Amino acid sequence: MKKGIFLSIGIAVLFSACGNSIDEKTVKKYENQLNQTVKQEIASLSQDSGIKIEFSDFKCNADGDFIACLSPNFKTLTKDNNDEYQELFQAKNIKIRSNEIYKGKANASISIKEYYNDLFKNQKSIQSNLVFEDFKLGEKVVSDINASLFQQDPKISSFINKLSSDSYTLSFDNSINKQENNYLDNLDIKFYNAKLNFNTNLNINLKEDLLNYLDSKGIKFNTQTLVMDKQAINELLNIANYEQASDFSNTIQKYIILNNFKIDSTLKTEGVFSSYIATAKENLQTLKAQSQNEEQALIFDKALAILNNITQNDDYKLNLDLKFKNIPVSDYSTQGIDSIEKLSINNQDATEALKIILPFIMFSMLMGGASF
């Protein structure tokens, strides 16, 4: 459900732009289109899922080369078994800031390639930022989380309850930079407060031919309404959803190259997991000693080294860096695990261990699916 809300607002950021000098008229036009798009997406989501969303209109203003917008008091609610609304989550403010501003002179629809060429005429990077301030789960959600853990240790139960009850900042930062024949797209997602800091990063290359493909599918940018052709987009997405082996899925993947995916996370545990971590380390030592072959020993040795590094003090730190080969996503079906160039976890090279263990994970998943 949350994914749908984030996607709704993200689409509004990605497919909204405005005029040349960011004057008051341009800002107002951007503001109106943003609110209209978000309301349409919320109405569709509410109709399909029965979720109630309390949303206040964005108010926008010029901020240098950017337009900054704010919407206060965001809430999502859903009905429980007693047909009463329960809060899923809320945010004190939603903030959007973007320099994706069309500065051309066209008065009609233009191709996607024309649109991006214009965007990069006077700026090296297109940046969009979406922030949920004081993001907090509803009381019923927190209660359900705690009930599902079946945790007997009162210290851990109290710790998890506080962690799930806290307020956080949730942010999405996306930047696109033009290179010779492609676009470098960098997405950062951050979820943090004083106790937990969880960051992910995805870095990809989009080939310029992707824009030509979208143009061939009739997707254009309307310079008057400041949005992409919604009907053409929906038609393209329908193909993606219902015809997985279609021209869309086969062609689009040829234009996308994953560079790397990262996770950087810190959790202040206050030492509540110490006894469990000690037991886990002892078990890994035992399994390593009892290994039947070198491959098993490698897996347990790497796991132990990584666990030691993550838990060397009460502030647990996880750093994961997954690098992919310089091949299009369309080649992954034939390359398989070899699509991965290197996996590092807390500066430990876990590539070979991953290649050994992943087939067993996939087999377990298939067997689990078969028994369903």
From Swiss-Prot:
Secretion signal span: 1-17
Location of the protein in the cell: Cell membrane
Record InterPro entries: JLPA (IPR032077)
Keyword Zinc: no
One GO CC term, this protein: plasma membrane
Gene Ontology biological process terms, A to Z: cell adhesion
Residues with a covalently attached lipid (S-diacylglycerol cysteine): C18
Keywords (A to Z) from UniProt: Cell membrane, Lipoprotein, Membrane, Palmitate, Signal
Listed name of the protein: Uncharacterized lipoprotein Cj0983
